[in-house]
């Protein structure tokens, strides 16, 4: 069942019907649906398809590639000894194909690029010297190692420089797309339940496929994560290992960021992980960011050299909070409902979901067309200078000289702004003005699930964004 992806499907269908050859790179995080999209788009019909091995050296990779050549109907008379020979055989498969458009799909390309294999040399030769000279080939390469795809294919500085005709960065579902999936699957979940499931798994389509009819949301979560043989109980063990060949230091970074809600600057990461300050650390941070596990941002008014790295992956955050301790209660989630631990987590997770739906928030605020920067901001208390000490998790700084200071509050009913909350908002506005020196107008903005209870304090809000608006 393919839900959403209309833009990507339209592009792939146009490519198939075009009268020239195309070289397409498809990338995105693990389990986002890249392979499924490509198979559905082309009706599972390929002149040749192959998936790299997660383990194995050059010899094993070429052997598997040769097996795929045989599956395509090619009679292999001699086992290829290198990638140049393997791609020569692929040329013969194409020459023998009767398909009007020869769709060549190579999945998990990064796994095939073993040490000193010269895979990219052979791929370059295949495209530049053969496929691009024809009009009937669509070459699609795909990998979950987003950073590898970006450096080796999309931004290739060698023979494949500027050779891609299309690239598709397949992103996770937004809430609207998850709701469409739930409806298509015939699941009876309301928007608050969809939101809560999103807080755990984000918009990764694969995870949504485990929901079962007839079970409540909490029963589903227990079945998927906490029962003895739950299918995703050990997911964290594979999440990073499947993307990075040597995941240990990546996981160290993730674990360090998981201890600090607002994130860490580079120096703090070095101190926490004991990873040396080097270009290798820079690469690992960039790779984690490109895969969507973390985000890099600059606190409002701060210099770029003090960039902050923040853990964003919903499942990883949930793992650290509830799964890392390996609870033995098979009904753990059902029994944890309305506990302080879960209520605290709901608030933090809701903030992350809001950060992933900035476009929807901007649409509700009527500023979709306004150039903006989305930041977080904090300052320490300094009573002598009238500074209270504030942490603001979302600031939308607008080109029209307005800042939306966003308070994100998860609630099971309409949210009530008390005197304490009102004072906190006023203090944040004051701190932001004093410390940053901004001259922008500051609009207090509430983002919550079911709106706000009308009282004297709520009148001070400039805008209210509700859960339904995040589904736009």
Task: Explain the meaning of each model-derived region.
Residues 358, 390-412, 425, 444:
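Conserved catalytic cores of phosphodiester-cleaving nucleases, focusing on short active-site segments
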Residues 206-207, 211-392:
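Accessory nucleic acid-recognition modules appended to NTPase machines
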Residues 168-193:
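Conserved small helical "lid"/interfacial subdomain of P-loop NTPases
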Residues 34:
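Conserved lysine of the Walker
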Residues 27, 31, 111-115, 119, ...:
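Sensor-1/coupling segment of RecA-like P-loop NTPase cores
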């Amino acid at each position: 069942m393919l839900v959403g992806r209309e833009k990507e499907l339209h592009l792939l269908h146009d490519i198939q019907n075009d009268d020239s050859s195309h070289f397409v790179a498809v990338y995105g995080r693990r389990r986002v649906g890249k392979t499924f999209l490509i198979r559905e788009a082309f009706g599972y019909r390929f002149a040749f398809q192959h998936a790299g091995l997660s383990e194995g050296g050059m010899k094993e990779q070429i052997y598997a590639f040769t097996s795929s050549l045989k599956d395509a109907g090619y009679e292999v008379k001699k086992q290829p000894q290198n990638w140049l020979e393997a791609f020569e055989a692929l040329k013969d498969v194409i020459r023998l194909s009767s398909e009007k458009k020869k769709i060549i799909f190579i999945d998990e390309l990064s796994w095939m690029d073993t040490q000193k294999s010269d895979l990219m040399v052979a791929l370059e030769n295949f495209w530049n010297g053969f496929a691009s000279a024809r009009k009937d080939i669509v070459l699609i390469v795909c990998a979950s190692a987003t950073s590898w795809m970006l450096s080796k294919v999309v931004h290739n500085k060698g023979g494949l420089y500027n050779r891609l005709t299309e690239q598709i960065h397949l992103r996770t579902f937004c809430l609207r797309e998850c709701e469409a999936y739930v409806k298509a699957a015939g699941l009876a979940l309301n928007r608050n339940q969809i939101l809560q499931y999103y807080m755990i798994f984000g918009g990764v389509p694969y995870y949504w496929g485990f929901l079962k009819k007839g079970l409540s949301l909490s029963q589903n979560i227990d079945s998927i994560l906490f029962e003895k043989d739950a299918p995703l109980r050990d997911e964290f063990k594979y999440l990073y290992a499947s993307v990075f060949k040597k995941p240990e230091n990546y996981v160290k970074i993730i674990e360090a960021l998981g201890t600090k809600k607002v994130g860490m600057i580079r120096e703090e990461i070095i101190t926490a992980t004991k990873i040396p300050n080097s270009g290798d650390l820079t690469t690992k941070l960039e790779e984690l960011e490109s895969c969507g596990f973390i985000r890099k941002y600059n606190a409002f008014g701060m210099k770029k050299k003090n960039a902050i790295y923040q853990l964003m992956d919903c499942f990883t955050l949930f793992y650290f909070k509830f799964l890392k301790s390996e609870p033995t209660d098979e009904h753990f989630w059902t029994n944890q409902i309305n506990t302080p631990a879960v209520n605290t987590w709901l608030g933090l997770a809701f903030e992350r979901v809001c950060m992933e739906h900035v476009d929807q928030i901007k649409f509700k605020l009527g500023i979709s067309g306004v150039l903006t920067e989305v930041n977080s901001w904090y300052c320490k208390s300094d009573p002598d200078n009238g500074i209270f000490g504030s942490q603001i998790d979302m600031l939308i700084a607008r080109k029209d000289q307005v800042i939306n200071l966003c308070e994100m509050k998860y609630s099971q009913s309409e949210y009530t702004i008390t005197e304490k909350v009102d004072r906190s908002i006023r203090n944040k506005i004051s701190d932001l003005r004093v410390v940053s020196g901004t001259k922008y107008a500051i609009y207090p903005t509430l983002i919550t699930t079911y709106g706000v209870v009308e009282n004297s304090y709520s009148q001070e809000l400039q805008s209210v964004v509700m859960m339904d608006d995040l589904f736009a």
